[in-house]
Each structure stands twice: as C-alpha cells, then as structure tokens.
C-alpha cells in the first residue's frame, strides 16, 4: 500500500511537495471583532460567489449580507465539514500546490465558525469590499473562443427518456492545421440540466485507423481547460469533432445543443510540448457488495516516457468515496501524489502549480486507488441492498483518473530535475 514518504532526489521522481499536517487554528483578532463586512464577505467573494449568485447553479445567492445572513448556520456546517466550497484534495498528504485553489484555510474556516457562533454580525458597512463583476453565465470560462463547433442537430431529451449514451459527429470546418491552447465543452443553457457528461475529441479522417485526439470533458463542476504555457494539442484540417454524450431525463422535455470552443495559438506558432490527457488506471472488474462502506480497487498505467504531470481528476460515480493517485518508480519506491475525497456532484480538475508538478522518469507506473461506499451512510446511494459493478449509467460504477501530462526527453527531464533540486536547496 502506498505511503507518504519524501521523494528521493536524483534518478527518482521529484517534486517540492508540502506533505503538511493541519496547523492549529489561531484567529488573529478577538472573536467579537469578526464581522461579515470586514472578514466574511472577502471569503465569499473569492471562494463562493462564482456559483452563489443569481442565474448560476447554486440554490441561493450570497452576494450581500441580507442574502447570506439567513444561511449563516448552513454556511458554517458546510465550511467546517469541508463540503463547501467543493475542493476535496486531502490537505494532509501529497502535493499541496494547485492552480485555481479556491479552498478555505484552517484560519478562514475558524473565522466563519466564529462569526456564526457570535451571532453573524454585519459590522461596519464601510468595511465591505467592492462588489465583484461577473461574466455572464452564458459566456465561456476560457474567454471568447476562436472557433466553435456544435453537435450536428439539437438533441431532444423527452421527460421520461432512459439514459442515452452515444457519439455525435460534426465537421470541424477547419481548413488548416492549428494548435489549441485552451478548450471548453459547453452544454446549451437549456440543455445543461440533462447533460451528465460530454467528452470531445478530434477525429483525423486521413488516418486509416481513425486517430482520435482528446480535447476536453464537460461534467458538473468541470469547466474549460487552459493549457500550461508552452503546451498545446494539435488538430488537423478536414477532420471531425466527436461528441461522446450522456443524457439523462429530468422530468421535463429538454433540448440541448452542446458545443466546443477552441482558442488557438497564432498561426505558425508551435508550442514546445504536446499536452496529453487520458483516463488511467481503468478498472472494469468492479465488485462492490451491498452494504459495504469501504471497497477498494486498484488500477495501473505505465509511462513510456519521462513526464511532467500537470493535472489530476478522480472519476467515480454515485458510490465513489475517495481516490488516490500514486507513482511506483523504476527503482520500486512508491509515492502518493494526491488524494481526494469524492462527491458525485462535482468533477474537479486539480491543476498542479508548475514548481511542484510531479516529474516522473520513464517506466514509472501510475497507481490509481479508489474506494466505494455502498452503505446507507452514502447520501448518493439509492439502494444499499444492491450489489454494484462497472457500467455506463450513473447508477453503475466506474474507477479511473483523468491525468494530464507532457513527455520530456532525457536531456529536458534531467534539466528539470536539476532546476527543481536547486530551487529546493535555495528554499532550505
């Protein structure tokens, strides 16, 4: 079983990781001084209001004191249990440097709890930060794309339709090869509630074997992908976009027109690295007995080249509980890179900061460990008396991780390791 141990410098994989113990919580000011205007509103603006505002996906708005105050006890409960905001990385093990990290610190959690326990005071209105400006919910998270392709026809999901899975194809319309630097797959506003997932890829029609290049996945809680600087994905002229769709009825006839938006590098610019994204550690031989709360499965994926891992995303279904991504190095030493609890409502990509992203030598085996909870303690479990196994429906189960990386030749890998070692020495 993988254990959390420091990386060995040199031949082994390397990251400057924070394998941190949770610090003792100390709130800087007196409890009576914690107010909404001065202390809580800035936290809500940074970590909550993208969803908790009118027209977005959350059930209530938290833009103002008047909106937030009736929900104070609920806010405390969700924050203290770390179920909100939805950021489920285990902060006590593995890498802790992530881009786009909107989670709360221990001190911020303590501050929210103190504010609620003290009666949730407003404070001085003059202390309120300026209101945030938000892009329209219909706008693209990656910014305005250079190219947009829709599914070929509007797709109608009747009010009581069974789950539907299938591939839809649209001509890309591209007349020249281009390198992509950002991509977002996006259901239509009306269709959003019925789209469980949408996976887009590029099919090269000139390839006899059918060459597919993954573009992006949409699922609840997962937005577009902005690739790390100097990386990209090439798409060929004359190909087709494949939309792998999963639709689920919601009791009302609903029409969807999912689309994918692409941002390109300037013509003639070729990024230094090709970014690869794949699901790894797939286990289709799942055996999850009824009533069992901690069922483990393991999957593996061998890296053929030196690699820098840029992102990790767990993928489970309703019974999912937790997943860890580990690495078994060529010298047989083992590392845990990241662990994340699982909530089926949120498919979150954890993007590593560049200076801590795992550097792994060729021959490393990625080890994906997943746990499922088929007991009545799992709020997502409709029937804890039922055995569960692998399948495509939400009521079936899955076990794999989405992982993104780019390959490095030996010279580039050794240079990256050396730079990481020097940075570590300078920090000591």
Question: Model regions: which residues?
Answer:
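N-terminal secretory signal peptides that target proteins for export/translocation
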Residues: 1-8
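Bacterial N-terminal signal peptides
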Residues: 10-23
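Basic/polar N-terminal segments that are highly enriched at the extreme N-terminus
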Residues: 23-31, 418-428
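Aromatic- and Gly/Pro-enriched helix-to-coil junctions and flexible linker segments
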Residues: 26-176, 188-189, 193, 238-244
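His-enriched metal-coordination microenvironments in redox/metal-binding proteins
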Residues: 137-412, 420-428
């Amino acid at each position: 079983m993988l254990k959390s141990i420091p990386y060995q410098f040199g031949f082994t994989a390397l990251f400057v990781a924070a394998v941190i113990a949770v610090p003792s919580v100390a709130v800087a000011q007196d409890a009576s001084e914690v107010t909404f205007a001065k202390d809580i509103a800035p936290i809500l603006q940074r970590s909550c209001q993208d969803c908790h505002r009118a027209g977005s996906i959350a059930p209530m708005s938290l833009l103002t004191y008047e909106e937030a105050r009736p929900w104070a006890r609920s806010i405390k409960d969700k924050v203290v249990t770390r179920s909100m905001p939805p950021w489920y990385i285990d902060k006590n093990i593995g890498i802790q440097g992530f881009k786009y990290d909107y989670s709360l610190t221990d001190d911020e959690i303590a501050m929210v709890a103190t504010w609620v326990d003290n009666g949730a005071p407003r404070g001085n209105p003059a202390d309120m930060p300026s209101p945030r400006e938000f892009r329209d919910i219909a706008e693209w998270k990656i910014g305005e794309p250079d190219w947009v392709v829709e599914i070929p026809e509007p797709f109608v999901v009747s009010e009581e339709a069974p789950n539907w899975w299938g591939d839809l194809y649209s001509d890309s319309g591209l007349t020249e090869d281009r390198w992509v630097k950002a991509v977002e797959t996006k259901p239509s506003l009306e269709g959003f509630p019925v789209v469980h997932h949408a996976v887009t890829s590029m099919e090269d029609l000139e390839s006899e074997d059918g060459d597919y290049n993954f573009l992006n996945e949409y699922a609840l809680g997962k937005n577009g992908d902005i690739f790390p600087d100097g990386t990209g994905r090439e798409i060929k002229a004359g190909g087709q976009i494949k939309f792998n769709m999963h639709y689920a009825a919601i009791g009302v006839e609903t029409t969807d027109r999912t689309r994918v938006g692409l941002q390109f590098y300037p013509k003639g610019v070729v990024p230094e690295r090709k970014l690869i994204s794949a699901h790894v550690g797939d286990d289709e031989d799942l055996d999850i007995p009824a009533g069992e709360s901690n069922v483990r499965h393991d999957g593996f994926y061998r890296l053929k080249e030196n690699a820098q891992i840029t992102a990790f995303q767990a993928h489970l279904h309703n019974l999912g509980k937790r997943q860890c991504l580990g690495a078994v190095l060529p010298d047989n030493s083992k590392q845990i890179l990241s662990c994340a609890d699982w909530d089926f409502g949120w498919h979150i990509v954890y993007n590593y900061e560049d200076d801590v992203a795992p550097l792994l030598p060729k021959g490393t085996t990625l080890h994906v460990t997943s746990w499922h909870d088929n007991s009545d303690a799992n709020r997502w479990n409709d029937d804890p008396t039922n055995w569960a196994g692998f399948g495509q429906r939400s009521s079936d189960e899955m076990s794999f991780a989405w992982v993104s990386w780019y390959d490095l030749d030996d010279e580039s890998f050794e240079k990256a390791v050396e730079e990481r070692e020097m940075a570590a020495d300078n920090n000591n």
